[in-house]
Amino acid sequence: MDSHAGNTADPRGSRRGVGLQGSGSPRARQLLERLDARPLAARAAADLSALVRKAGATLRLRHKEAISGLDSADIEVADSRLPHATLVEHRPQHQRSDTQGPRMEPLPVIQNKASYASRLPQATGRFSVELVRGPAGFGLTLSGGRNVSGNVPLAVCGLLKDGPAQRCGHLQAGDLVLYINGQSTRGLTHAQAVEWIRTGGPRLCLVLQRPQEMNGSRSKEVGGGHQKTDRIPDPRGGRMMESRGTISPVHHRPKTRTGPGPSPESVATGHVVRAAEHPAEDLEDRIPGSPGPWLVPSEDRLSRALGIRGGGVQLAQEMAAGRRRH
């Protein structure tokens, strides 16, 4: 509505309507709820202009503040005032945006604080507990703190039965106390921590961390390392060996003789070399790239080829005698 509606006379011929006296009379830039018993919500300016033109010389307006008090006002508008009726639709939109603006601004701030509080325990592995002092205190005992021997982490020692700490359902014995009412417990003595709790008021806010969450990943890594250094069976026999301390069996090649004659030590002791040659041939067969057993003749074949009778003992004696001659 325009401010001309509040004047007693208008130069363009409009006259003041009935019922404008008193506190219930409409004011300029006032939110309008209904126009001729029709709600104005979600109506465009063209629709409002059409309603004003169809209303004739009398409009019945109901402002928004009068809904609760069931109050209304009658205003007579001449045809010359019809172009000014378009202000009715523009003013409530501007006023509504102004009134709802301050209400919507604090909401993102509150949501950011709530989301940060919910993300804090997940991101750092910590959790917070707020306790209210009961008749017997907060119902928990502490252990640790800085002393003469060293700095022991401050932790929850025990929970009083049916106390506030036990009823909250989050605390356990052994939880590390990191903060007391927003203050870090690093470097605190046991007496100082107890004094902070006593003088902190009826509410106690603790930030804690469970030891299993800190050492869980470390224990898994150590356990996996032991499994890697476990002993494995030797493929050459029932003997066990460690993978880090021993060399692969491929590098352990047995030393075998390729010559046809026995060593001087075997001749001196009188041992027959035939029994030692067969395992040597078997080992040479297993190693790829080594010469076959046909290149290393046995003593029987060699003695038969040379026409020597008496077997390997006589052959060994003759070969030893030949070496002495040379």
Swiss-Prot record:
Superkingdom as given in the UniProt entry: Eukaryota
Region (Disordered): 1-32, 214-267
All residue ranges annotated as the PDZ domain in the record: 128-212
Keyword S-adenosyl-L-methionine among UniProt keywords: no
Residues with Phosphoserine modification: 263
Keyword NAD annotated: no
Keywords of this entry: Phosphoprotein
Disulfide bonds: none
SUPFAM superfamilies, sorted: PDZ domain-like
Extent of Basic and acidic residues compositional bias: 218-242
InterPro entries: MAGIX, PDZ, PDZ_sf
Stored CDD domains: PDZ5_MAGI-1_3-like (cd06735)
Gene3D superfamilies: 2.30.42.10
PANTHER family linked to this entry: PDZ DOMAIN-CONTAINING PROTEIN MAGIX
Protein known as: PDZ domain-containing protein MAGIX
Species assigned in the record: Rattus norvegicus (Rat)
Lineage: Eukaryota, Metazoa, Chordata, Craniata, Vertebrata
